[in-house]
Protein backbone atom coordinates (compact mmCIF):
# COMPACT_ATOMS: atom_id res chain seq x y z
CA UNK A 1 0.00 0.00 0.00
CA UNK A 2 1.58 3.28 -1.11
CA UNK A 3 1.63 5.84 1.68
CA UNK A 4 2.91 9.29 0.76
CA UNK A 5 1.11 11.59 3.19
CA UNK A 6 3.51 13.59 5.30
CA UNK A 7 6.53 11.64 4.06
CA UNK A 8 9.61 13.57 3.02
CA UNK A 9 12.56 12.03 1.27
CA UNK A 10 13.16 9.60 -1.52
CA UNK A 11 11.23 6.55 -2.66
CA UNK A 12 13.08 4.15 -0.37
CA UNK A 13 11.80 5.97 2.69
CA UNK A 14 8.27 5.76 1.33
CA UNK A 15 8.70 2.07 0.57
CA UNK A 16 10.03 1.27 4.05
CA UNK A 17 6.97 2.88 5.55
CA UNK A 18 4.72 1.10 3.07
CA UNK A 19 5.79 -2.27 4.45
CA UNK A 20 4.58 -1.32 7.94
CA UNK A 21 1.09 -0.25 6.89
CA UNK A 22 -1.82 -2.68 7.13
CA UNK A 23 -3.53 -2.73 3.74
CA UNK A 24 -7.02 -3.25 5.18
CA UNK A 25 -7.09 -0.68 7.96
CA UNK A 26 -4.40 1.74 6.81
CA UNK A 27 -2.83 1.55 10.28
CA UNK A 28 0.93 1.71 10.73
CA UNK A 29 2.17 0.03 13.92
CA UNK A 30 5.48 1.90 13.93
CA UNK A 31 3.92 5.37 13.76
CA UNK A 32 0.48 4.61 15.30
CA UNK A 33 -1.01 6.57 12.41
CA UNK A 34 -3.93 5.63 10.18
CA UNK A 35 -3.17 6.56 6.57
CA UNK A 36 -5.84 7.20 3.97
CA UNK A 37 -6.55 4.27 1.69
CA UNK A 38 -7.59 6.68 -1.05
CA UNK A 39 -5.34 7.60 -3.95
CA UNK A 40 -3.33 10.68 -2.95
CA UNK A 41 -4.54 13.91 -4.53
CA UNK A 42 -2.11 16.22 -6.29
CA UNK A 43 -1.84 19.79 -5.03
CA UNK A 44 -0.46 22.64 -7.17
CA UNK A 45 3.23 23.37 -6.44
CA UNK A 46 2.93 27.07 -7.31
CA UNK A 47 3.10 28.84 -3.96
CA UNK A 48 1.61 32.04 -5.39
CA UNK A 49 -1.91 30.96 -6.26
CA UNK A 50 -5.30 32.09 -5.01
CA UNK A 51 -8.26 29.72 -4.81
CA UNK A 52 -10.38 31.79 -7.22
CA UNK A 53 -7.76 31.52 -9.98
CA UNK A 54 -7.37 27.82 -9.25
CA UNK A 55 -11.12 27.15 -9.55
CA UNK A 56 -11.34 29.21 -12.75
CA UNK A 57 -8.52 27.18 -14.31
CA UNK A 58 -10.09 23.76 -13.78
CA UNK A 59 -11.05 21.89 -16.97
CA UNK A 60 -14.66 20.87 -17.54
CA UNK A 61 -17.40 21.22 -20.15
CA UNK A 62 -20.04 22.79 -17.91
CA UNK A 63 -22.17 25.57 -19.44
CA UNK A 64 -24.61 26.85 -16.79
CA UNK A 65 -23.17 27.20 -13.28
CA UNK A 66 -26.07 28.73 -11.31
CA UNK A 67 -29.86 28.82 -11.66
CA UNK A 68 -32.13 30.84 -9.36
CA UNK A 69 -34.92 28.40 -8.49
CA UNK A 70 -37.32 31.27 -7.75
CA UNK A 71 -36.78 33.63 -10.69
CA UNK A 72 -35.28 31.23 -13.22
CA UNK A 73 -32.29 33.53 -13.77
CA UNK A 74 -29.27 31.62 -15.08
CA UNK A 75 -25.55 32.32 -14.89
CA UNK A 76 -23.16 30.73 -17.37
CA UNK A 77 -19.56 30.02 -16.42
CA UNK A 78 -18.29 32.93 -18.58
CA UNK A 79 -20.82 35.24 -16.89
CA UNK A 80 -19.68 34.04 -13.46
CA UNK A 81 -16.02 34.77 -14.12
CA UNK A 82 -16.74 38.09 -15.82
CA UNK A 83 -18.83 39.07 -12.78
CA UNK A 84 -16.07 38.02 -10.39
CA UNK A 85 -13.51 40.10 -12.29
CA UNK A 86 -15.75 43.17 -12.41
CA UNK A 87 -16.77 42.99 -8.74
CA UNK A 88 -13.12 42.54 -7.76
CA UNK A 89 -12.30 45.70 -9.72
CA UNK A 90 -15.05 47.63 -7.95
CA UNK A 91 -13.92 46.37 -4.55
CA UNK A 92 -10.38 47.49 -5.32
CA UNK A 93 -11.72 50.92 -6.31
CA UNK A 94 -13.50 51.06 -2.94
CA UNK A 95 -10.17 50.47 -1.21
CA UNK A 96 -10.41 46.75 -0.40
CA UNK A 97 -6.89 45.30 -0.25
CA UNK A 98 -5.12 42.07 0.57
CA UNK A 99 -5.71 41.05 4.18
CA UNK A 100 -8.87 43.16 4.60
CA UNK A 101 -11.99 41.38 5.84
CA UNK A 102 -15.30 41.63 3.96
CA UNK A 103 -18.47 40.28 5.59
CA UNK A 104 -21.46 38.86 3.73
CA UNK A 105 -24.86 38.58 5.43
CA UNK A 106 -27.21 37.00 2.93
CA UNK A 107 -29.47 34.02 2.35
CA UNK A 108 -28.46 31.62 -0.43
CA UNK A 109 -28.21 33.43 -3.75
CA UNK A 110 -26.64 32.87 -7.16
CA UNK A 111 -24.69 36.07 -6.44
CA UNK A 112 -23.22 34.83 -3.13
CA UNK A 113 -20.33 32.98 -4.87
CA UNK A 114 -19.56 36.01 -7.05
CA UNK A 115 -18.98 38.01 -3.87
CA UNK A 116 -16.87 35.40 -2.09
CA UNK A 117 -14.77 34.52 -5.16
CA UNK A 118 -14.10 38.19 -5.99
CA UNK A 119 -13.07 38.98 -2.42
CA UNK A 120 -10.69 36.01 -2.26
CA UNK A 121 -9.21 36.84 -5.69
CA UNK A 122 -7.93 40.12 -4.21
CA UNK A 123 -6.24 38.34 -1.33
CA UNK A 124 -8.90 39.82 0.95
CA UNK A 125 -10.77 37.62 3.42
CA UNK A 126 -14.45 36.70 3.19
CA UNK A 127 -16.33 36.10 6.43
CA UNK A 128 -19.88 34.75 6.32
CA UNK A 129 -22.65 35.61 8.77
CA UNK A 130 -25.78 33.52 9.20
CA UNK A 131 -28.95 35.48 8.36
CA UNK A 132 -30.87 33.74 11.15
CA UNK A 133 -28.37 34.92 13.77
CA UNK A 134 -29.43 37.71 16.09
CA UNK A 135 -27.98 41.20 15.85
CA UNK A 136 -26.02 40.54 19.05
CA UNK A 137 -24.44 37.42 17.54
CA UNK A 138 -23.57 39.25 14.33
CA UNK A 139 -22.22 42.16 16.37
CA UNK A 140 -19.73 39.85 18.10
CA UNK A 141 -18.55 38.58 14.72
CA UNK A 142 -18.16 42.12 13.39
CA UNK A 143 -16.32 43.17 16.53
CA UNK A 144 -13.91 40.26 16.22
CA UNK A 145 -13.29 40.28 12.46
CA UNK A 146 -13.40 44.08 11.91
CA UNK A 147 -14.65 44.06 8.29
CA UNK A 148 -13.94 47.04 6.03
CA UNK A 149 -17.04 46.36 3.90
CA UNK A 150 -20.28 44.40 4.05
CA UNK A 151 -22.55 42.77 1.49
CA UNK A 152 -26.17 42.23 2.50
CA UNK A 153 -29.75 42.36 1.24
CA UNK A 154 -32.32 45.09 1.68
CA UNK A 155 -34.26 42.94 4.13
CA UNK A 156 -31.18 42.32 6.27
CA UNK A 157 -29.58 45.76 6.23
CA UNK A 158 -31.47 46.79 9.38
CA UNK A 159 -30.11 43.74 11.23
CA UNK A 160 -26.61 44.60 10.04
CA UNK A 161 -27.08 48.20 11.16
CA UNK A 162 -28.18 47.03 14.60
CA UNK A 163 -25.09 44.82 14.79
CA UNK A 164 -22.56 47.41 13.67
CA UNK A 165 -21.09 49.95 16.06
CA UNK A 166 -19.26 51.98 13.43
CA UNK A 167 -19.95 53.44 9.98
CA UNK A 168 -19.70 50.15 8.07
CA UNK A 169 -19.79 50.56 4.26
CA UNK A 170 -22.50 48.34 2.75
CA UNK A 171 -23.14 47.01 -0.75
CA UNK A 172 -26.71 45.85 -1.38
CA UNK A 173 -27.12 42.50 -3.14
CA UNK A 174 -30.65 43.09 -4.45
CA UNK A 175 -32.73 45.86 -5.99
CA UNK A 176 -35.66 45.97 -3.63
CA UNK A 177 -36.68 49.27 -2.09
CA UNK A 178 -34.56 50.23 0.90
CA UNK A 179 -36.63 51.65 3.77
CA UNK A 180 -36.09 55.37 4.16
CA UNK A 181 -35.43 54.97 7.88
CA UNK A 182 -32.13 56.27 9.11
CA UNK A 183 -29.46 53.87 10.29
CA UNK A 184 -27.54 56.64 11.96
CA UNK A 185 -23.79 56.30 11.67
CA UNK A 186 -23.83 52.49 11.84
CA UNK A 187 -23.84 51.69 8.12
CA UNK A 188 -23.16 53.62 4.93
CA UNK A 189 -24.66 52.45 1.63
CA UNK A 190 -21.88 52.59 -0.97
CA UNK A 191 -23.24 50.63 -3.92
CA UNK A 192 -25.24 47.79 -5.41
CA UNK A 193 -23.87 44.43 -6.46
CA UNK A 194 -25.81 44.37 -9.74
CA UNK A 195 -24.22 47.68 -10.73
CA UNK A 196 -20.78 46.29 -9.91
CA UNK A 197 -21.40 43.23 -12.08
CA UNK A 198 -22.17 45.53 -15.03
CA UNK A 199 -19.24 47.90 -14.42
CA UNK A 200 -16.02 47.69 -16.39
CA UNK A 201 -13.05 48.42 -14.09
CA UNK A 202 -12.27 52.13 -14.45
CA UNK A 203 -8.59 51.70 -13.69
CA UNK A 204 -6.02 48.98 -14.18
CA UNK A 205 -5.61 47.69 -10.66
CA UNK A 206 -2.32 46.36 -9.39
CA UNK A 207 -2.85 42.70 -8.58
CA UNK A 208 -1.25 41.86 -5.27
CA UNK A 209 0.53 38.52 -5.11
CA UNK A 210 -1.48 35.99 -3.09
CA UNK A 211 0.24 33.12 -1.32
CA UNK A 212 -1.49 29.76 -0.88
CA UNK A 213 -0.87 30.12 2.86
CA UNK A 214 -2.70 33.46 3.06
CA UNK A 215 -6.11 33.47 4.75
CA UNK A 216 -8.97 33.28 2.23
CA UNK A 217 -12.03 32.76 4.43
CA UNK A 218 -12.97 33.35 8.04
CA UNK A 219 -15.85 31.09 9.06
CA UNK A 220 -17.10 31.22 12.62
CA UNK A 221 -17.34 28.00 14.60
CA UNK A 222 -17.84 27.09 18.24
CA UNK A 223 -14.56 25.20 18.00
CA UNK A 224 -13.50 22.76 20.65
CA UNK A 225 -13.95 25.06 23.65
CA UNK A 226 -17.54 26.16 23.07
CA UNK A 227 -17.08 29.85 22.33
CA UNK A 228 -17.45 31.22 18.81
CA UNK A 229 -14.12 31.75 17.06
CA UNK A 230 -13.09 32.67 13.55
CA UNK A 231 -11.63 29.69 11.70
CA UNK A 232 -8.91 30.88 9.33
CA UNK A 233 -9.03 28.85 6.13
CA UNK A 234 -6.18 29.42 3.70
CA UNK A 235 -6.20 29.37 -0.08
CA UNK A 236 -4.32 26.06 0.20
CA UNK A 237 -7.08 24.65 2.43
CA UNK A 238 -9.75 25.52 -0.13
CA UNK A 239 -7.65 24.30 -3.07
CA UNK A 240 -7.24 20.98 -1.24
CA UNK A 241 -11.01 20.88 -0.72
CA UNK A 242 -11.53 21.35 -4.47
CA UNK A 243 -9.15 18.47 -5.19
CA UNK A 244 -10.93 16.27 -2.63
CA UNK A 245 -14.22 17.00 -4.42
CA UNK A 246 -12.60 16.15 -7.74
CA UNK A 247 -11.52 12.78 -6.33
CA UNK A 248 -14.99 12.04 -4.95
CA UNK A 249 -17.46 13.39 -7.50
CA UNK A 250 -17.93 13.37 -11.26
CA UNK A 251 -17.87 16.36 -13.58
CA UNK A 252 -20.83 18.35 -14.92
CA UNK A 253 -23.49 17.03 -12.53
CA UNK A 254 -26.68 18.83 -11.46
CA UNK A 255 -27.61 19.59 -7.86
CA UNK A 256 -29.91 21.73 -5.70
CA UNK A 257 -28.46 24.06 -3.07
CA UNK A 258 -30.51 24.43 0.11
CA UNK A 259 -27.71 24.16 2.68
CA UNK A 260 -26.68 27.67 3.81
CA UNK A 261 -23.66 28.99 1.94
CA UNK A 262 -22.59 30.72 5.16
CA UNK A 263 -21.91 27.25 6.64
CA UNK A 264 -18.75 25.31 5.72
CA UNK A 265 -20.83 22.49 4.17
CA UNK A 266 -22.53 24.96 1.82
CA UNK A 267 -19.60 27.34 1.34
CA UNK A 268 -17.16 24.55 0.52
CA UNK A 269 -19.54 22.86 -1.89
CA UNK A 270 -21.75 25.41 -3.61
CA UNK A 271 -19.61 28.56 -3.38
CA UNK A 272 -16.27 26.95 -4.25
CA UNK A 273 -15.73 23.20 -4.76
CA UNK A 274 -18.51 22.19 -7.15
CA UNK A 275 -17.94 25.21 -9.39
CA UNK A 276 -14.52 23.77 -10.23
CA UNK A 277 -16.17 20.55 -11.42
CA UNK A 278 -18.47 22.27 -13.90
CA UNK A 279 -21.65 21.49 -11.98
CA UNK A 280 -24.99 23.23 -12.47
CA UNK A 281 -26.23 24.43 -9.08
CA UNK A 282 -29.90 25.35 -8.67
CA UNK A 283 -30.14 27.73 -5.70
CA UNK A 284 -33.04 27.94 -3.26
CA UNK A 285 -32.88 30.92 -0.85
CA UNK A 286 -33.93 28.69 2.05
CA UNK A 287 -35.03 25.13 2.66
CA UNK A 288 -38.54 24.18 1.64
CA UNK A 289 -39.20 20.46 1.09
CA UNK A 290 -41.82 20.93 -1.63
CA UNK A 291 -39.67 23.44 -3.53
CA UNK A 292 -36.60 21.22 -3.16
CA UNK A 293 -38.36 18.16 -4.58
CA UNK A 294 -39.99 20.21 -7.32
CA UNK A 295 -36.57 21.58 -8.27
CA UNK A 296 -35.13 18.04 -8.47
CA UNK A 297 -37.93 17.11 -10.88
CA UNK A 298 -37.77 20.30 -12.97
CA UNK A 299 -33.99 20.56 -13.24
CA UNK A 300 -33.28 16.80 -13.32
CA UNK A 301 -30.90 16.94 -10.39
CA UNK A 302 -28.54 14.00 -10.01
CA UNK A 303 -27.06 14.90 -6.61
CA UNK A 304 -28.48 16.32 -3.39
CA UNK A 305 -26.47 17.48 -0.37
CA UNK A 306 -28.62 17.15 2.73
CA UNK A 307 -28.36 17.31 6.51
CA UNK A 308 -29.79 14.31 8.45
CA UNK A 309 -33.12 15.95 9.45
CA UNK A 310 -34.03 16.32 5.76
CA UNK A 311 -33.08 12.71 5.06
CA UNK A 312 -35.38 11.69 7.93
CA UNK A 313 -38.18 13.84 6.52
CA UNK A 314 -37.79 12.18 3.12
CA UNK A 315 -38.06 8.78 4.79
CA UNK A 316 -41.17 9.72 6.75
CA UNK A 317 -42.88 11.22 3.71
CA UNK A 318 -41.67 8.68 1.17
CA UNK A 319 -45.07 7.46 -0.03
CA UNK A 320 -46.39 10.94 -0.76
CA UNK A 321 -43.08 12.11 -2.24
CA UNK A 322 -42.76 9.18 -4.64
CA UNK A 323 -46.35 9.57 -5.83
CA UNK A 324 -46.10 13.33 -6.32
CA UNK A 325 -42.59 13.92 -7.70
CA UNK A 326 -40.44 12.40 -10.43
CA UNK A 327 -37.08 11.83 -8.75
CA UNK A 328 -35.77 9.41 -11.37
CA UNK A 329 -32.79 11.67 -12.17
CA UNK A 330 -31.53 11.53 -8.58
CA UNK A 331 -28.84 8.93 -7.94
CA UNK A 332 -26.82 10.27 -4.98
CA UNK A 333 -27.52 11.95 -1.65
CA UNK A 334 -24.50 13.38 0.15
CA UNK A 335 -25.25 13.55 3.88
CA UNK A 336 -23.20 15.63 6.30
CA UNK A 337 -23.49 17.54 9.55
CA UNK A 338 -24.12 14.50 11.78
CA UNK A 339 -24.06 10.69 11.42
CA UNK A 340 -27.12 8.87 10.05
CA UNK A 341 -28.38 5.87 11.97
CA UNK A 342 -28.53 2.45 10.36
CA UNK A 343 -32.32 2.51 10.67
CA UNK A 344 -32.67 5.77 8.75
CA UNK A 345 -30.18 4.69 6.08
CA UNK A 346 -31.91 1.35 5.49
CA UNK A 347 -35.36 2.94 5.31
CA UNK A 348 -34.13 5.57 2.87
CA UNK A 349 -32.62 2.96 0.55
CA UNK A 350 -35.79 0.89 0.83
CA UNK A 351 -37.96 3.84 -0.25
CA UNK A 352 -35.53 5.25 -2.83
CA UNK A 353 -33.77 2.13 -4.16
CA UNK A 354 -31.99 3.92 -7.03
CA UNK A 355 -30.38 6.47 -4.71
CA UNK A 356 -27.22 5.88 -2.69
CA UNK A 357 -26.38 7.82 0.47
CA UNK A 358 -22.76 8.91 0.75
CA UNK A 359 -21.98 9.97 4.30
CA UNK A 360 -19.08 12.14 5.30
CA UNK A 361 -17.42 13.67 8.34
CA UNK A 362 -15.59 16.93 8.70
CA UNK A 363 -15.32 20.11 10.72
CA UNK A 364 -15.11 23.78 9.90
CA UNK A 365 -11.55 23.48 11.22
CA UNK A 366 -10.79 20.80 8.60
CA UNK A 367 -12.50 22.66 5.73
CA UNK A 368 -15.30 20.07 5.98
CA UNK A 369 -12.93 17.28 4.91
CA UNK A 370 -11.90 14.32 7.10
CA UNK A 371 -13.69 11.10 6.12
CA UNK A 372 -16.11 10.24 3.33
CA UNK A 373 -17.81 7.55 1.29
CA UNK A 374 -17.17 7.33 -2.45
CA UNK A 375 -19.39 4.53 -3.74
CA UNK A 376 -22.40 2.30 -3.08
CA UNK A 377 -20.31 -0.54 -1.66
CA UNK A 378 -18.99 1.74 1.08
CA UNK A 379 -22.51 2.82 2.04
CA UNK A 380 -23.17 -0.69 3.34
CA UNK A 381 -20.88 0.01 6.32
CA UNK A 382 -23.78 1.29 8.42
CA UNK A 383 -22.94 3.83 11.09
CA UNK A 384 -19.64 4.74 9.46
CA UNK A 385 -18.69 8.15 8.11
CA UNK A 386 -16.50 6.61 5.42
CA UNK A 387 -12.77 6.17 4.90
CA UNK A 388 -10.20 8.86 5.65
CA UNK A 389 -10.27 11.31 2.75
CA UNK A 390 -7.30 11.60 0.35
CA UNK A 391 -4.13 12.98 1.98
CA UNK A 392 -5.69 12.74 5.46
CA UNK A 393 -3.84 11.05 8.31
CA UNK A 394 -5.58 10.06 11.52
CA UNK A 395 -4.69 9.17 15.10
CA UNK A 396 -6.91 7.85 17.85
CA UNK A 397 -5.77 9.25 21.20
CA UNK A 398 -6.93 8.31 24.69
CA UNK A 399 -8.33 11.63 25.99
CA UNK A 400 -7.39 10.82 29.58
CA UNK A 401 -3.86 9.41 29.21
CA UNK A 402 -2.74 10.79 25.85
CA UNK A 403 -1.80 7.29 24.74
CA UNK A 404 -2.12 6.65 21.00
CA UNK A 405 -4.52 3.79 20.29
CA UNK A 406 -4.99 1.34 17.43
CA UNK A 407 -7.64 -0.41 15.34
CA UNK A 408 -11.14 -0.67 16.84
CA UNK A 409 -10.13 1.33 19.93
CA UNK A 410 -12.18 4.39 20.87
CA UNK A 411 -10.54 7.72 21.62
CA UNK A 412 -10.35 11.28 20.36
CA UNK A 413 -9.74 11.53 16.62
CA UNK A 414 -6.80 13.69 15.60
CA UNK A 415 -6.28 14.46 11.92
CA UNK A 416 -3.52 15.99 9.83
CA UNK A 417 -4.06 17.08 6.24
CA UNK A 418 -3.76 19.98 3.78
CA UNK A 419 -7.32 20.95 4.74
CA UNK A 420 -6.54 21.62 8.43
CA UNK A 421 -7.11 25.30 9.22
CA UNK A 422 -4.36 27.84 9.82
CA UNK A 423 -5.77 28.48 13.27
CA UNK A 424 -8.31 30.58 15.13
CA UNK A 425 -8.38 34.28 14.28
CA UNK A 426 -6.57 36.41 16.87
CA UNK A 427 -6.65 33.52 19.35
CA UNK A 428 -3.23 31.88 19.71
CA UNK A 429 -4.21 30.14 22.95
CA UNK A 430 -7.20 28.36 21.41
CA UNK A 431 -5.14 27.49 18.32
CA UNK A 432 -2.35 25.97 20.42
CA UNK A 433 -4.82 23.83 22.37
CA UNK A 434 -6.46 22.57 19.16
CA UNK A 435 -3.49 22.04 16.79
CA UNK A 436 -0.27 20.57 18.19
CA UNK A 437 3.29 21.37 17.07
CA UNK A 438 3.22 18.56 14.49
CA UNK A 439 0.06 19.87 12.80
CA UNK A 440 -2.43 17.43 14.34
CA UNK A 441 -5.95 18.85 14.70
CA UNK A 442 -7.72 17.58 17.81
CA UNK A 443 -11.29 17.12 16.61
CA UNK A 444 -12.92 16.79 20.02
CA UNK A 445 -14.88 13.78 18.73
CA UNK A 446 -14.69 10.29 20.19
CA UNK A 447 -14.19 7.90 17.28
CA UNK A 448 -12.77 4.56 16.30
CA UNK A 449 -11.40 3.26 13.02
CA UNK A 450 -12.25 -0.34 12.22
CA UNK A 451 -10.20 -3.08 10.59
CA UNK A 452 -11.18 -1.90 7.12
CA UNK A 453 -10.28 1.74 7.73
CA UNK A 454 -13.82 3.07 8.23
CA UNK A 455 -14.25 5.96 10.67
CA UNK A 456 -17.06 5.72 13.23
CA UNK A 457 -18.05 8.79 15.26
CA UNK A 458 -19.16 7.61 18.71
CA UNK A 459 -19.68 10.76 20.75
CA UNK A 460 -18.74 14.42 21.03
CA UNK A 461 -15.94 14.82 23.48
CA UNK A 462 -16.09 18.57 23.08
CA UNK A 463 -19.69 18.74 24.38
CA UNK A 464 -21.06 20.78 21.52
CA UNK A 465 -24.68 20.16 20.61
CA UNK A 466 -25.48 19.52 16.94
CA UNK A 467 -28.98 20.79 16.12
CA UNK A 468 -30.07 20.58 12.48
CA UNK A 469 -26.42 20.56 11.46
CA UNK A 470 -25.60 23.72 13.47
CA UNK A 471 -23.26 23.84 16.43
CA UNK A 472 -24.67 24.98 19.76
CA UNK A 473 -22.26 25.72 22.60
CA UNK A 474 -23.67 24.78 26.03
CA UNK A 475 -21.44 27.41 27.65
CA UNK A 476 -23.13 30.20 25.68
CA UNK A 477 -26.62 29.13 26.76
CA UNK A 478 -25.50 28.57 30.36
CA UNK A 479 -24.16 32.13 30.51
CA UNK A 480 -27.52 33.44 29.31
CA UNK A 481 -29.42 31.36 31.85
CA UNK A 482 -27.20 32.44 34.73
CA UNK A 483 -27.99 36.06 33.88
CA UNK A 484 -31.63 35.43 34.86
CA UNK A 485 -32.31 36.91 38.32
CA UNK A 486 -34.18 33.80 39.51
CA UNK A 487 -31.68 31.15 38.37
CA UNK A 488 -29.00 30.03 40.81
CA UNK A 489 -27.25 27.48 38.59
CA UNK A 490 -27.68 25.93 35.16
CA UNK A 491 -26.29 23.26 32.86
CA UNK A 492 -27.13 22.58 29.22
CA UNK A 493 -26.82 19.21 27.51
CA UNK A 494 -28.10 17.67 24.27
CA UNK A 495 -31.30 15.68 24.11
CA UNK A 496 -31.65 13.30 21.14
CA UNK A 497 -34.21 14.02 18.44
CA UNK A 498 -34.98 11.94 15.35
CA UNK A 499 -35.36 14.96 13.07
CA UNK A 500 -32.91 17.55 14.41
CA UNK A 501 -30.28 15.13 15.69
CA UNK A 502 -30.09 16.92 19.03
CA UNK A 503 -31.76 19.78 20.88
CA UNK A 504 -30.46 21.83 23.81
CA UNK A 505 -31.96 20.88 27.17
CA UNK A 506 -31.41 22.80 30.41
CA UNK A 507 -31.08 21.62 34.00
CA UNK A 508 -31.96 24.50 36.30
CA UNK A 509 -31.47 25.26 39.98
CA UNK A 510 -33.94 27.99 40.98
CA UNK A 511 -33.11 30.55 43.61
CA UNK A 512 -34.85 30.16 46.96
CA UNK A 513 -38.46 31.30 46.78
CA UNK A 514 -38.59 31.29 42.98
CA UNK A 515 -41.45 29.65 41.09
CA UNK A 516 -39.88 30.17 37.68
CA UNK A 517 -41.54 27.87 35.12
CA UNK A 518 -40.21 25.87 32.19
CA UNK A 519 -42.03 28.06 29.66
CA UNK A 520 -40.68 31.26 31.22
CA UNK A 521 -37.12 29.95 30.98
CA UNK A 522 -37.56 28.80 27.39
CA UNK A 523 -39.04 32.17 26.44
CA UNK A 524 -36.23 34.05 28.18
CA UNK A 525 -33.62 32.26 26.08
CA UNK A 526 -35.63 32.28 22.84
CA UNK A 527 -35.70 36.08 22.77
CA UNK A 528 -31.90 36.24 22.73
CA UNK A 529 -30.72 33.46 20.41
CA UNK A 530 -31.09 31.96 16.95
CA UNK A 531 -33.89 29.38 16.48
CA UNK A 532 -31.54 26.38 16.55
CA UNK A 533 -30.16 27.47 19.93
CA UNK A 534 -33.52 27.55 21.70
CA UNK A 535 -33.94 25.46 24.85
CA UNK A 536 -36.53 22.75 24.10
CA UNK A 537 -36.82 21.13 27.53
CA UNK A 538 -36.19 22.17 31.15
CA UNK A 539 -35.75 20.02 34.24
CA UNK A 540 -35.36 21.42 37.75
CA UNK A 541 -32.77 20.05 40.17
CA UNK A 542 -31.66 20.81 43.72
CA UNK A 543 -28.04 21.05 42.52
CA UNK A 544 -25.95 20.60 39.37
CA UNK A 545 -23.46 17.70 39.66
CA UNK A 546 -19.88 18.99 39.45
CA UNK A 547 -16.38 17.69 40.08
CA UNK A 548 -14.11 19.16 42.79
CA UNK A 549 -12.80 21.82 40.40
CA UNK A 550 -16.33 22.97 39.63
CA UNK A 551 -16.65 21.48 36.15
CA UNK A 552 -20.16 20.31 35.29
CA UNK A 553 -20.42 16.52 35.10
CA UNK A 554 -22.42 16.46 31.90
CA UNK A 555 -22.24 12.70 31.58
CA UNK A 556 -24.09 12.38 34.87
CA UNK A 557 -26.81 14.66 33.54
CA UNK A 558 -26.91 12.70 30.28
CA UNK A 559 -27.44 9.48 32.25
CA UNK A 560 -30.21 11.16 34.21
CA UNK A 561 -31.85 12.34 30.99
CA UNK A 562 -31.56 8.94 29.32
CA UNK A 563 -33.17 7.21 32.28
CA UNK A 564 -36.22 9.48 31.95
CA UNK A 565 -36.68 9.16 28.18
From Swiss-Prot:
Its cofactor is Mg(2+). Keywords: ATP-binding, Ligase, Magnesium, Nucleotide-binding, Peroxisome. PROSITE patterns: AMP_BINDING. CoA binds at residues 286, 469. ATP binds at residues 221-225, 229, 359-360, 364, 445, 460, 551. A motif (Microbody targeting signal) lies at residues 563-565. It catalyses: (E)-4-coumarate + ATP + CoA = (E)-4-coumaroyl-CoA + AMP + diphosphate; (E)-4-coumarate + ATP + H(+) = (E)-4-coumaroyl-AMP + diphosphate; (E)-4-coumaroyl-AMP + CoA = (E)-4-coumaroyl-CoA + AMP + H(+). It is found in: Peroxisome. It comes from the Eukaryota. (E)-4-coumaroyl-AMP binds at residues 265, 337, 359-360, 364, 462, 466. Its EC number is 6.2.1.12. Residues 360-424 are annotated as: SBD2. Pfam families: AMP-binding (PF00501), AMP-binding_C (PF13193). It is an enzyme of class 6 (ligase). GO terms for cellular component: peroxisome. Its main location: other. GO terms for molecular function: 4-coumarate-CoA ligase activity; ATP binding. Residues 288-359 are annotated as: SBD1. Both substrate-binding domains (SBD1 and SBD2) are involved in the substrate recognition, and are sufficient to confer the substrate specificity. Belongs to the ATP-dependent AMP-binding enzyme family. Carboxylate--CoA ligase that may use 4-coumarate as substrate. Follows a two-step reaction mechanism, wherein the carboxylate substrate first undergoes adenylation by ATP, followed by a thioesterification in the presence of CoA to yield the final CoA thioester. PANTHER family: 4-COUMARATE--COA LIGASE-LIKE 2, LONG-CHAIN-FATTY-ACID--COA LIGASE. This is 4-coumarate--CoA ligase-like 2. It comes from Arabidopsis thaliana (Mouse-ear cress).
Amino acid sequence: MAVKHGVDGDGSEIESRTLAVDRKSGFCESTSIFYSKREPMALPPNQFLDVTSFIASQPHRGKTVFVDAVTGRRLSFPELWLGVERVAGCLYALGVRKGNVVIILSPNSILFPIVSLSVMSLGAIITTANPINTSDEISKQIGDSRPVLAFTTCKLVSKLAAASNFNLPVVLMDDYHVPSQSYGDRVKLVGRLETMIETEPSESRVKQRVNQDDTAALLYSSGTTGTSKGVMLSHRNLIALVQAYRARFGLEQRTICTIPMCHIFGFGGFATGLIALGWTIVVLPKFDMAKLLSAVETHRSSYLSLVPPIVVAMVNGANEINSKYDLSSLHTVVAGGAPLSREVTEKFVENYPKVKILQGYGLTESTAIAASMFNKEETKRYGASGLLAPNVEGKIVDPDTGRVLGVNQTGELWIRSPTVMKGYFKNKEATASTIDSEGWLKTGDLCYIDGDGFVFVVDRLKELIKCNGYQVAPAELEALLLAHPEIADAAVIPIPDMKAGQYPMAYIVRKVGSNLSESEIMGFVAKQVSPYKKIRKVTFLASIPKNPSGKILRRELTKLTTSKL
